[in-house]
Amino acid sequence: MSFSNTNTGDKIADPYKEKNSDVNVTIKEKVEDLTDFISACKFGMMTTRVGDSGALVSRCMALAGKESGGIDLIFHTNTESGKTDDIDSDSHINISFLNSSGEWASISGTASIITDTAVVERYYHPTLKAWLGDLGDGTHDGGPHDPRIGIIKVTARTATYAVIKKSAISRVAEIAQGVTTGKAASVNKLREISEQEVATWRSSNKMVE
């Protein structure tokens, strides 16, 4: 099913997407530019679905690591928080990133909660103690063996992102020209990484590993 509110005939209904889509790019360049952008942002919004209501909930999360050549994302979590309940009920997830220049990325996939001690220790950082606290019972101390510390691994399925391809002055001029002429502004490199491209990238990195 799709939504449409009008018929533009033989005219392109979404000229912005047509003008900014960057399709002649290798999978390697697509993924590497995406992962560089994500690493620079560091903080993203994680969106999950609440099991009993179906409501979408987002919260800010700090990137803790990347796997599969950068396409799969790692986050710390308190296993007793609401987001782990959401993921246990529905593993579908979205992670989005945005910077002050208007560049953005959206990764759609599935999430898994990992409590394996070796994995937790691999990604553990002492600053986690500031978020979990020390409950004073000798077990829940915010350290690497605190059973409340888990890992959320986001296995990417698809990704869409936009990075800027022109200077700020050029973008302003392009937008002004668009307002005057009615022609869509060309200001971003709008890229999509398909499910097949994600699978290809993940497989190629497994062979390297």
PLM segments and residue spans:
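Charged, amphipathic alpha-helical segments
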Residues: 27-31, 80, 129-130
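Short beta-strand segments
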Residues: 42-79, 85-88, 93-99, 104-112
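Short gly/pro-enriched beta-turn/loop segments at secondary-structure junctions
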Residues: 39-41, 70, 90, 145-149, ...
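Short, structured beta-strand-loop surface elements
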Residues: 82-149
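C-terminal edge-of-domain segments
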Residues: 2-23, 142-209
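Short, basic/aromatic recognition patches
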Residues: 20-43
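Short N-terminal helix-initiation segments at or just after the protein's N-terminus
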Residues: 3-15, 35-40, 56, 89-99
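Short Pro/Gly-enriched beta-strand edge/turn motifs at strand-loop
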Residues: 40-47, 131-136
